[in-house]
Amino acid sequence: MLISNEWLKEYVTIDDSVSNLAERITRTGIEVDDLIDYTKDIKNLVVGFVKSKEKHPDADKLNVCQVDIGEDEPVQIVCGAPNVDAGQYVIVAKVGGRLPGGIKIKRAKLRGERSEGMICSLQEIGISSNYIPKSFESGIYVFSESQVPGTDALQALYLDDQVMEFDLTPNRADALSMIGTAYEVAALYNTKMTKPETTSNELELSANDELTVTIENEDKVPYYSARVVHNVTIEPSPIWMQARLIKAGIRPINNVVDISNYVLLEYGQPLHMFDQDAIGSQQIVVRQANEGEKMTTLDDTERELLTSDIVITNGQTPIALAGVMGGDFSEVKEHTSNIVIEGAIFDSVSIRHTSRRLNLRSESSSRFEKGIATEFVDEAVDRACYLLQTYANGKVLKDRVSSGELGAFITPIDITADKINRTIGFDLSQNDIVTIFNQLGFDTEINDDVITVQVPSRRKDITIKEDLIEEVARIYGYDDIPSTLPVFEKVTSGQLTDRQYKTRMVKEVLEGAGLDQAITYSLVSKEDATAFAMQQRQTIDLLMPMSEAHASLRQSLLPHLIEAASYNVARKNKDVKLFEIGNVFFANGEGELPDQVEYLSGILTGDYVVNQWQGKKETVDFYLAKGVVDRVSEKLNLEFSYRRADIDGLHPGRTAEILLENKVVGFIGELHPTLAADNDLKRTYVFELNFDALMAVSVGYINYQPIPIFPGMSRDIALEVDQNIPAADLLSTIHAHGGNILKDTLVFDVYQGEHLEKGKKSIAIRLNYLDTEETLTDERVSKVQAEIEAALIEQGAVIR
């Protein structure tokens, strides 16, 4: 189940981040398997208005568009989408923007015409083609409603959102709906849950005058109801509704079908919409299928039915396969005007057997299989009527046509506070226990020491006292249960934690690389407090410092490491290689405890190799310092990438940010010549890493890798590219297309000058191939090499 935070806020308001909410939900029994951020890797995406469109003079399939993006003048964008036209509101990625997949938007010339941006499809902003409306599958997205040019496109699309993906166990079917999840969140945060509007303005005409409902076997179909809505207008649903469906993994179709799916997600109650005029009669009969009976479902497939299947009929012919899929001739089409809305309870075993036999698993069948909340059946139908009235101009007929019995909305269970306390191992008052049940939306009655809990039908997992005890424990918070000292019969020796072990390994790696560990003061001068800080936040100053040099808590380890290097050089120890693992501190406002983050930093200056027996003398440079950092990443089984950066205090051309999973976790670079001279240092290189961030991502470490027993191959490639293209971008493309046999790459030559155009450079790269399972063949390597070269050419490189 995919839960949109933006949608969830409609029912329950909490003051907490989505990541904290996900953590809290996980700790109380529903695992949040993933957190999907639709804003990730997207930058400078705005709404644009296409003011004009002209054919490209030199390309039949391209159009030259003038697009208003909220700036002083329209921008010219060359677009190849077949559906682009003047008068449209579209998604525009501005120059300097980014799109998923690492795509950077730059000024370009396409067949001689200037293009300053990109008009985007939904696929290009990260939406799967499985969920995109069919009208936009092969072209750009066009807003169906007027927008303000220049506004944030993600906000206009309701995609500035984070979505939690639940990995639900079968017993928690209540969380297969937004309202069920809202009840859970309201309980966790002790707040109120607000239900959506369900009341329509009804006509005097009664649905009973137009329709009858009959159930032939109430053991298989305990309840079936229908409501009628006239004069609906079939059109696209509102953008916000389409966005919520897309984020939930459902493709928008039209407003009527979308409302059916929307209510399914909202209440967990599957609905079906029939074209009333196509049903063929004024009666609905729900029965078992006849032996050998056939029907054609919505996917244009003729199905042969068994007597165990439940069908919805018009008295004669099946018009739907109950709980699984509708029939083709009664489906909602573009010309549909009158709607019959079905809300029912079907036998879960029958639905499971039918859906599995026909391989027709759907959102509806999965919910029927797990059991439906009787309290929501009619409410969900009423909600659909309200939405059809609001967003399809429908006229709702009064009354509900139904057959069968809904059954009990609640199940009473008696329990005592003493029973709960004896089970969970600590004492809660009766009032505390009742409060927790009320938070969950369970009504309670108290008779002396007995608490009668009215469990609603949505919580089918609660049937006995022990289930109620579990609810008390998890909502109270497993982490908040008081700790008690256990009684040990024997004492076992302690051991290092995973983090302690990894920290020791990192220290050993750095010491093996020739660095010495330093331990410096946490206090620095106010001037140095924010030097090299990766987060620009308020400093923490001492009220009564012992000296100006120790007046604030540091936000970087480097100021004192630079001071230590300067101290050593001044005393004739000119070859300095130091590292430190220590805490830095960031303020959180008055009265709040600061954030304490562990960093790893290093400094290298002078000669790296100084003894004759170690080999040729080698002076510290950028790549040597980078090699030290890479040793750390390799030991922690992490993969760093590097991106050119400008950081105060560092050389503007010899500095890079260090990224882990596309997030900046540190930097490396040469100390700015002015700062180095002020400290009497020659060329000096520093690095700093957020050690906490590394520990949070690292899931293992490498102690040993077997020596390959099969020979590898190497291929060299020379590329001519624009001089402003970093080698890292080329390496990223190479690795993305190298498959599992490309083991590593090495830039061994960079050339600019004679025989190259101005603004161009030549980069020579060695590609090392290896298969640990078998000997590589030339054909296999050549095939991968060809794919890599094609990708590089597409990126703009020329193979030399």
Swiss-Prot record:
It holds the Pfam family B5. Residues 408-483 form the B5 domain. The keyword rRNA-binding does not apply. InterPro entries: aa-tRNA-synth_II/BPL/LPL (IPR045864), B3/B4_tRNA-bd (IPR005146), DNA-bd_dom_put_sf (IPR009061), Fdx_antiC-bd (IPR005121), Fdx_antiC-bd_sf (IPR036690), NA-bd_OB-fold (IPR012340), Phe-tRNA-ligase_IIc_bsu (IPR045060), Phe-tRNA-ligase_IIc_bsu_bact (IPR004532). Its cofactor is Mg(2+). It catalyses: tRNA(Phe) + L-phenylalanine + ATP = L-phenylalanyl-tRNA(Phe) + AMP + diphosphate + H(+). One of its GO terms (molecular function) is phenylalanine-tRNA ligase activity. Binds 2 magnesium ions per tetramer. PANTHER family: PHENYLALANINE--TRNA LIGASE BETA SUBUNIT (PTHR10947:SF0), PHENYLALANYL-TRNA SYNTHETASE BETA CHAIN AND LEUCINE-RICH REPEAT-CONTAINING PROTEIN 47 (PTHR10947). Tetramer of two alpha and two beta subunits. HAMAP family: Phe_tRNA_synth_beta1. Belongs to the phenylalanyl-tRNA synthetase beta subunit family. Type 1 subfamily. This is Phenylalanine--tRNA ligase beta subunit. It comes from Staphylococcus aureus (strain bovine RF122 / ET3-1).
